[in-house]
C-alpha cells in the first residue's frame, strides 16, 4: 500500500508518496501561482506511474487543504498536526521545529510535551518575505542561502505585519 500526502499552501503544492516502510517513492514541490487546481492535477499526474494500480491512502493538509478536501473528497489533516506527526515519525530526536510558510510561521516544541504556536496570516518573516528578498537581490532561495553563509552582520527584520 502507498500513502499520498498532499500539502496545498498559500504559494506551493507539495506531494509525497510513501511506501509501508515510510520510504519516499515519489515527491514533488511546485509553485502554484494561484492556479491551485491545475498545479494539483500536475503533481498528482506526475505520481501516476509510481502509484500504478496499488492501493493508496490519501490526505491533504495546508492552508488550502480544506477546500481541496471537499473538492477531491479526501481527508483533511490540520497542517501543524501533520507536521508534528512527520517530525515524530522521521526525526524523533527533534526538540524544536520551525516551519516558515508563504504567509505564516509555526513553531513546535516537542520536549516535555507538545506545545505549538502559529502566527496569524501575514507574510512578515515568512517564506513570502524571503521570496521577495530573493527577487530584489536577483536570486532564488538557494542563492539567498549562499549569500547568507558568509555573513558578517546580523540585521533585525520585522517579523510581523503592520
What are these regions (language model features)?
Residues 41-45, 65, 69, 81-88, ...:
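Predominant activation on well-ordered alpha-helical scaffold segments within soluble catalytic domains
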Residues 30-34, 80-86, 120-128:
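Short, acidic/turn-prone active-site loops that include or flank metal/cofactor-
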Residues 64-115:
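Conserved phosphate-binding catalytic cores of ATP/NTP-utilizing and phosphoryl-transfer enzymes
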Amino acid at each position: 500500500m502507498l500513502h499520498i500526502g498532499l500539502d496545498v499552501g498559500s504559494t506551493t503544492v507539495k506531494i509525497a508518496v510513501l511506501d509501508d516502510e515510510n520510504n519516499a517513492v515519489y515527491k514533488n514541490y511546485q509553485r502554484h501561482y494561484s492556479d491551485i487546481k491545475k498545479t494539483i492535477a500536475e503533481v498528482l499526474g506526475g505520481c501516476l506511474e509510481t502509484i500504478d494500480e496499488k492501493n493508496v491512502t490519501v490526505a491533504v493538509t495546508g492552508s488550502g487543504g480544506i477546500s481541496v478536501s471537499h473538492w477531491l473528497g479526501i481527508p483533511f489533516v490540520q497542517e501543524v498536526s501533520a507536521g508534528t506527526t512527520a517530525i515524530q515519525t522521521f526525526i524523533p530526536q527533534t526538540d524544536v521545529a520551525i516551519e516558515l510558510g508563504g504567509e505564516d510561521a509555526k513553531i513546535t516544541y516537542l520536549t516535555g510535551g507538545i506545545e505549538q504556536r502559529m502566527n496569524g496570516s501575514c507574510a512578515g518573516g515568512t517564506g513570502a518575505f524571503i521570496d521577495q528578498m530573493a527577487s530584489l537581490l536577483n536570486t532564488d532561495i538557494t542563492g539567498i542561502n549562499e549569500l547568507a553563509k558568509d555573513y558578517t552582520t546580523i540585521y533585525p527584520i520585522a517579523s510581523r505585519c503592520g
